[in-house]
């Protein structure tokens, strides 16, 4: 695992990296991600420059690397990180890593919905929560299906690690996150796949027993409505 202290690279070196791959959407004047032909990815963070920004003291790239370490310790599949860099005299940090094998759930929903196993996917979310892991920005685009019933995570800059299973209220908020994406929900419905929320609720019923299911689903609906 690369050090949390980035290697300083020149602007020329950065340009060589940028021109060697396919650029993703631009953010703060730089591509958020670069996809390379050798199945590696370069993720970029153009650090916020405000004095009160926490990224001044703890860059997002460092959080990403640390989260990868902690997730691996919990048995979660994450990309193998290759290098950690910062452009000289600049606020841009970069992390290069090997792509996880497989396809995102989002890709599969569009092109091969028959390969999506909703019960096992719901179980994966449940297992994360039981381990005390809250991936705040989780959605079907950053959950990778490595093989049937086997998953991994990408783009995990913002993750919390609790020392106990995630409380139900926070689980509901987390489950609401992927259900805010209308195109994903549309694909789920059009593919006649089992309902994702119902699959998660069924796991809760079997493992937790009595809980306020109405309050749980109400929290999810409120979160979805708030963000839509």
Model-derived regions: residue spans:
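Short, solvent-exposed loop/turn segments at secondary-structure boundaries
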Residues: 54-56, 109-113, 165-167
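Juxta-kinase regulatory segment immediately upstream of eukaryotic protein kinase catalytic domains
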Residues: 1-22, 217-227
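Conserved kinase catalytic-core helix
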Residues: 67-77, 106-141
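C-lobe/activation-segment region of protein kinase-like
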Residues: 151-228
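Conserved protein kinase catalytic core
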Residues: 49, 104, 161
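Conserved ATP-binding subdomain of kinase catalytic cores across diverse folds
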Residues: 13-101, 126-131
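Soluble or luminal CAZymes and related metallo-dependent hydrolases
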Residues: 59-63, 117-120, 192
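Conserved protein kinase catalytic/activation segment
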Residues: 142-154
